[in-house]
Amino acid sequence: CPRSVKRVTVNGHEGTLVDLTGIAHFVVEGVEPSEGFFRAAESIFSGIAGLDACGVIFLDVEKRSMIPLVKVIETDSLVWEGSCGSGSVACAVVQSERMENGGFSCEYRQPAGAVRASVERQGGNVIAASIGGEVTLDEPMRITL
């Protein structure tokens, strides 16, 4: 469940910063996915204690799709993720912001597949969150080096 949720504006684009403790995501709509936008947003994560990773989630509500760009703090690496469970939860938190009580669930299409994120709210607060989806395994392959 989120430690904090707040509206933030970056380069004229309003989005929602969701702190999930250890990882935080800035969920934004109507922005073309780019490393440049991540760099512009990066400073909004600086005041959050104990982050192992942070990301910008480029959300398209109409298509129910998202593209996650995540930075791992320790290695200073920026990665276009194929799928992101915590980013999916952040999107569900954002999309359910106006709910006082009840559940919200959405399957978010991502570059490597779909992840279903669900949140339960009580008194306006998120009291439970979960993710799920189909998992497939490819045939093992052997590589000789």
Explain the meaning of each model-derived region:
Residues 1-83, 90-145:
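Active-site proximal loop and beta-alpha junction motif in alpha/beta enzyme cores
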